[in-house]
């Protein structure tokens, strides 16, 4: 089973944008990518998800993250569905969608629930080193909240770049607002360093193990 922290498997996939090699197609450009699966083309919940993602596409790209979809449908089904979305909803889907019609990649990534033949609503966030940083699953009957996924991606980027952790509902946390959490001290020396930083006003603390600061 694939888990967070592992290298994304090297695979060649057929998509609506042609054949793509993952993760190289994105990592060689220095980009992160978001692989997400949907149960099936021409279904209502999936249509709302594709519409919602497309109108937020630039927000993902501003963070250096490229979406790529996947289902066990064939590529011609993807293309016809996208034509329908453009014609009926006025939105052109710009990101590629994998035609995993044999389910090989979906099986490898654990996207197909027990007893099912179609993919769940899985999301894999993969960084520019090809490492899986987050995995999220939704059931078929509940559509994803792309704004929450955007928050997750932004938080992962900040954590990677700044070496901090992000609290519940960041940047609207009920305790510390938009501030970020300093990793807990893991030695007596680090506890002293936290105390010194607190005395200088560089961080705030509820206790030695719960310190936070403004995002720099």
Curated annotation (Swiss-Prot):
Disulfide-linked positions: 205-211
Binding site residues for substrate: 121
Record's catalysed reaction(s): a hydroperoxide + [thioredoxin]-dithiol = an alcohol + [thioredoxin]-disulfide + H2O
GO cellular component terms attached to this protein's record: cytosol
Pfam families assigned: 1-cysPrx_C, AhpC-TSA
Keywords assigned: Antioxidant, Cytoplasm, Disulfide bond, Oxidoreductase, Peroxidase, Redox-active center
Name the UniProt record assigns to this protein: Peroxiredoxin
Organism this protein belongs to: Pyrococcus furiosus (strain ATCC 43587 / DSM 3638 / JCM 8422 / Vc1)
Source taxonomy: Archaea, Methanobacteriati, Methanobacteriota, Thermococci, Thermococcales
């Amino acid at each position: 089973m694939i888990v967070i922290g592992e290298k994304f498997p090297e695979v060649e996939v057929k998509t609506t944008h042609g054949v793509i090699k993952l993760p190289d197609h994105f990592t060689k450009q220095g980009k992160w990518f978001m692989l997400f699966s949907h149960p099936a083309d021409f279904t209502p919940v999936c249509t709302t998800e594709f519409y919602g993602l497309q109108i937020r596409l630039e927000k993902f790209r501003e963070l250096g993250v490229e979406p790529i979809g996947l289902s066990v449908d064939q590529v011609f089904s993807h293309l016809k569905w996208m034509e329908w979305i453009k014609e009926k909803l006025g939105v052109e889907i710009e990101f590629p969608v994998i035609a995993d019609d044999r389910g090989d990649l979906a099986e490898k990534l654990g996207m197909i629930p027990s007893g099912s033949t179609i993919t769940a609503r899985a999301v894999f966030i993969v960084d520019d080193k090809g490492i899986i940083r987050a995995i999220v699953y939704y059931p078929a009957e509940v559509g994803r909240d792309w704004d929450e996924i955007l928050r997750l991606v932004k938080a992962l980027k900040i954590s990677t770049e700044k070496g901090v952790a992000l609290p519940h509902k960041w940047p609207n946390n009920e305790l510390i607002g938009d501030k970020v959490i300093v990793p807990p001290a893991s030695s007596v020396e680090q506890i002293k360093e936290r105390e010194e930083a607190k005395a200088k006003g560089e961080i705030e603390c509820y206790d030695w193990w719960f310190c936070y600061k403004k995002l720099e």
